[in-house]
Amino acid sequence: MRTLKFLTVIFLLTISSNNLFGQGACACCTDNHTSFDFWVGDWIVFDTSGNKIGENRIEKLEGNCLINEHWTGLKGSTGCSYNYYEPSDSTWNQLWVDNQGSNLILKSRAESNKMILKSKFQKSPNGNLYTNRITWTLNTDGSVTQRWDIADENDQLLSVAFIGIYRKK
Protein backbone atom coordinates (compact mmCIF):
# COMPACT_ATOMS: atom_id res chain seq x y z
CA MET A 1 0.00 0.00 0.00
CA ARG A 2 2.84 2.40 0.90
CA THR A 3 4.59 1.56 -2.37
CA LEU A 4 1.44 2.37 -4.36
CA LYS A 5 1.05 5.74 -2.58
CA PHE A 6 4.73 6.51 -3.13
CA LEU A 7 4.51 5.68 -6.85
CA THR A 8 1.34 7.77 -7.18
CA VAL A 9 3.06 10.77 -5.56
CA ILE A 10 6.12 10.36 -7.83
CA PHE A 11 3.87 10.13 -10.89
CA LEU A 12 1.95 13.28 -9.93
CA LEU A 13 5.17 15.19 -9.21
CA THR A 14 6.56 14.17 -12.59
CA ILE A 15 3.46 15.44 -14.41
CA SER A 16 3.45 18.67 -12.37
CA SER A 17 7.14 19.36 -12.95
CA ASN A 18 6.73 18.85 -16.71
CA ASN A 19 4.02 21.49 -16.76
CA LEU A 20 5.88 23.84 -14.41
CA PHE A 21 9.15 23.70 -16.33
CA GLY A 22 7.74 23.91 -19.84
CA GLN A 23 8.15 20.29 -20.85
CA GLY A 24 4.53 20.10 -21.98
CA ALA A 25 2.87 21.54 -25.08
CA CYS A 26 4.23 24.70 -26.69
CA ALA A 27 2.56 27.63 -24.93
CA CYS A 28 3.25 30.06 -27.78
CA CYS A 29 2.39 27.90 -30.79
CA THR A 30 -1.21 29.10 -31.16
CA ASP A 31 -2.45 30.77 -34.36
CA ASN A 32 -2.32 34.13 -32.56
CA HIS A 33 1.29 33.59 -31.47
CA THR A 34 2.36 32.61 -35.00
CA SER A 35 0.54 35.35 -36.94
CA PHE A 36 3.78 37.36 -37.34
CA ASP A 37 5.93 34.35 -38.32
CA PHE A 38 5.90 35.47 -41.97
CA TRP A 39 8.53 38.04 -40.92
CA VAL A 40 10.91 35.46 -39.41
CA GLY A 41 14.08 34.83 -41.44
CA ASP A 42 17.30 36.35 -42.72
CA TRP A 43 16.57 39.25 -45.05
CA ILE A 44 18.22 41.72 -47.37
CA VAL A 45 16.21 44.96 -47.30
CA PHE A 46 15.79 47.19 -50.35
CA ASP A 47 14.24 50.60 -50.93
CA THR A 48 11.48 51.07 -53.51
CA SER A 49 14.11 51.74 -56.22
CA GLY A 50 15.73 48.34 -55.61
CA ASN A 51 18.80 49.65 -53.78
CA LYS A 52 20.03 47.59 -50.83
CA ILE A 53 19.64 49.59 -47.61
CA GLY A 54 20.42 46.96 -44.99
CA GLU A 55 19.97 43.50 -43.59
CA ASN A 56 17.61 42.19 -40.96
CA ARG A 57 17.69 38.93 -39.01
CA ILE A 58 14.36 38.03 -37.44
CA GLU A 59 14.32 35.01 -35.13
CA LYS A 60 12.02 33.30 -32.67
CA LEU A 61 13.28 32.92 -29.12
CA GLU A 62 12.03 31.88 -25.69
CA GLY A 63 10.09 28.82 -26.78
CA ASN A 64 8.54 30.68 -29.76
CA CYS A 65 7.12 33.35 -27.42
CA LEU A 66 9.37 36.17 -28.68
CA ILE A 67 10.31 37.47 -32.12
CA ASN A 68 13.67 39.24 -31.98
CA GLU A 69 14.79 41.62 -34.74
CA HIS A 70 18.42 42.61 -35.46
CA TRP A 71 18.66 45.46 -38.03
CA THR A 72 21.92 46.58 -39.64
CA GLY A 73 21.69 49.47 -42.09
CA LEU A 74 24.30 50.17 -44.77
CA LYS A 75 24.91 53.65 -43.36
CA GLY A 76 25.79 52.40 -39.86
CA SER A 77 22.40 52.31 -38.16
CA THR A 78 21.60 49.30 -36.00
CA GLY A 79 18.58 48.39 -33.94
CA CYS A 80 16.73 45.61 -32.18
CA SER A 81 13.11 44.95 -31.54
CA TYR A 82 11.28 42.55 -29.27
CA ASN A 83 7.86 41.46 -30.51
CA TYR A 84 5.36 39.33 -28.64
CA TYR A 85 1.70 38.40 -28.52
CA GLU A 86 -0.12 39.36 -25.31
CA PRO A 87 -3.06 36.98 -24.73
CA SER A 88 -4.62 39.10 -21.96
CA ASP A 89 -5.65 41.80 -24.47
CA SER A 90 -5.16 39.88 -27.75
CA THR A 91 -2.53 42.32 -29.05
CA TRP A 92 0.89 42.21 -30.62
CA ASN A 93 3.49 44.44 -28.99
CA GLN A 94 6.85 45.74 -30.16
CA LEU A 95 9.67 47.53 -28.36
CA TRP A 96 12.25 49.00 -30.77
CA VAL A 97 15.59 50.54 -29.71
CA ASP A 98 18.35 51.72 -32.06
CA ASN A 99 21.88 53.10 -31.90
CA GLN A 100 20.64 56.61 -32.73
CA GLY A 101 18.87 56.90 -29.37
CA SER A 102 15.39 56.29 -30.74
CA ASN A 103 12.84 53.93 -29.31
CA LEU A 104 9.28 53.03 -30.17
CA ILE A 105 6.59 51.14 -28.31
CA LEU A 106 3.96 49.80 -30.69
CA LYS A 107 0.79 47.79 -30.18
CA SER A 108 -2.16 46.45 -32.19
CA ARG A 109 -3.74 43.34 -33.67
CA ALA A 110 -2.68 41.12 -36.56
CA GLU A 111 -4.61 40.78 -39.79
CA SER A 112 -4.34 38.07 -42.44
CA ASN A 113 -0.77 38.18 -43.88
CA LYS A 114 -0.32 41.63 -42.38
CA MET A 115 0.75 43.22 -39.11
CA ILE A 116 -0.15 46.83 -38.33
CA LEU A 117 1.33 48.23 -35.11
CA LYS A 118 0.83 51.75 -33.77
CA SER A 119 2.40 53.91 -31.10
CA LYS A 120 0.44 55.97 -28.60
CA PHE A 121 -0.22 59.52 -29.72
CA GLN A 122 2.68 61.90 -29.26
CA LYS A 123 2.96 65.68 -29.57
CA SER A 124 5.03 67.12 -32.39
CA PRO A 125 7.18 70.23 -31.75
CA ASN A 126 4.32 72.37 -33.12
CA GLY A 127 1.84 70.78 -30.69
CA ASN A 128 -0.05 68.51 -33.10
CA LEU A 129 -0.76 64.90 -32.17
CA TYR A 130 0.64 62.11 -34.31
CA THR A 131 1.15 58.35 -34.19
CA ASN A 132 3.67 55.98 -35.73
CA ARG A 133 1.89 53.31 -37.79
CA ILE A 134 4.10 50.52 -39.10
CA THR A 135 2.69 47.88 -41.43
CA TRP A 136 4.38 44.63 -42.46
CA THR A 137 2.72 42.92 -45.43
CA LEU A 138 3.49 39.44 -46.76
CA ASN A 139 3.65 39.72 -50.54
CA THR A 140 2.67 36.93 -52.95
CA ASP A 141 6.33 36.35 -53.94
CA GLY A 142 7.32 35.68 -50.30
CA SER A 143 8.90 39.09 -49.77
CA VAL A 144 7.69 41.39 -46.99
CA THR A 145 7.04 45.11 -47.32
CA GLN A 146 7.49 47.27 -44.22
CA ARG A 147 5.93 50.72 -44.37
CA TRP A 148 6.28 53.25 -41.56
CA ASP A 149 3.68 56.01 -41.70
CA ILE A 150 3.23 59.06 -39.53
CA ALA A 151 -0.50 59.67 -39.09
CA ASP A 152 -2.58 62.34 -37.39
CA GLU A 153 -5.18 61.84 -34.67
CA ASN A 154 -7.77 60.98 -37.37
CA ASP A 155 -5.44 58.29 -38.76
CA GLN A 156 -4.79 60.40 -41.87
CA LEU A 157 -1.34 60.08 -43.44
CA LEU A 158 1.04 62.95 -42.66
CA SER A 159 4.23 61.44 -44.06
CA VAL A 160 6.00 58.19 -44.90
CA ALA A 161 9.10 57.65 -42.74
CA PHE A 162 10.30 54.39 -44.31
CA ILE A 163 9.47 51.77 -46.91
CA GLY A 164 11.58 48.62 -47.02
CA ILE A 165 11.15 45.51 -49.14
CA TYR A 166 12.51 42.40 -47.45
CA ARG A 167 13.84 39.60 -49.65
CA LYS A 168 15.14 36.32 -48.19
CA LYS A 169 18.92 35.88 -48.30
Task: For each feature predicted by the language model, list its residue ranges.
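Hydrophobic small-molecule pocket/channel-lining residues, especially in calycin-type beta-barrels
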Residues: 22-169
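Bacterial Sec-dependent N-terminal signal peptides
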Residues: 1-25
